[in-house]
Amino acid sequence: YKKDAKKEGFVYIQEKISLDDTITASQLYTLAGKMGARLLSSHLDAILNQNLLPEPQDEEETVYCQLLSKIDALLNSQTMTAQQAEQQIRAYEIFPKTKIEISGFLCIINEANVVDAKATPLDIEFKDSKYLRIKKLTALSGKQMNADSFINGYLK
């Protein structure tokens, strides 16, 4: 979705944030918040003195993310790759939280990684024949636990 620069306002200063394959939504928010505070404090005088003037956003560079719903949180191993699932877990860490059904239990996945071979009951195969290895999850009880605790408490 494209933003409407007229609705979104102007930009005084910006920096790019480099993302790696491990950053979570909360880490990105923290990083962006610190960067925003640093940029504002270092440029506020120039803005107030009109030495730094606003510029319209570049229409080619601006994108808008649609609002997420709880329906977006469900993983589908038939339509997603394991990498897409792992990325969704990190992106939806705060809301709507990524969910999957495991042996009849709807669980929130808190941490996982992609592996090539199945080694535990919590290694879920995806459409690319790779597996999502669930490391931490929240069960219906609301308690976050590691994979072994879930296996011992729910699958045995």
Where are these regions (language model features)?
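Short secondary-structure boundary/capping segments
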Residues: 2-4, 65-67, 99, 123-124
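Acyl-group handling in specialized metabolite and lipid biosynthesis
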Residues: 67-80
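An anion-binding loop in the catalytic cleft
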Residues: 78-156
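Short, conserved beta-strand edge motifs with alternating hydrophobic and charged residues
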Residues: 14, 56, 76, 99-101
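Short amphipathic alpha-helical segments
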Residues: 15, 71-73, 130-132
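Generic anion/oxyanion-binding catalytic loop in active/binding sites
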Residues: 17, 29, 73-74, 139
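Donor/substrate-binding cores of folate-linked one-carbon enzymes
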Residues: 1-64
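Amphipathic alpha-helical surface "interface" segments used
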Residues: 59-69, 106-110
